[in-house]
């Protein structure tokens, strides 16, 4: 009632069923659209734990192992190079071979070297000056050597799609 949030949906699950489900408030205040129990929400980074659980379920089912090279499922990750430098004046990029392949575990732990463009100056430079799309950029460090917040979870989602033959939303 104090308008702190526009709307919400609550659900209580008990004994395999829904004991309670209810919509409150507005899905869109500006248009006056009421919240419904089937309103679709943008959940942003909450997809990370959901995708990670999907990967762990596939591991439990024996469909993959955490130390599998990610390139076994996504060939585009094979032989990823590590960024050494980006010359913003000439748009030239210097890379070197990675010490080892990126694994599923690296993608789960954000230790793959794959960065978001907004999370590192190097990744921004690769996009802005060298014109390299994020999905094709060299990695920022050797896999497993350090933590870098990045789009590894997106690659995990693509791995789920590859193994399951379904889109992640399914």
What does each model-identified segment do?
Residues 17-18, 63:
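Residue-level signal for well-ordered, solvent-exposed loop/turn and beta-edge residues enriched
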Residues 28-148:
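Active-site-proximal loop and beta-strand segments within enzyme catalytic domains
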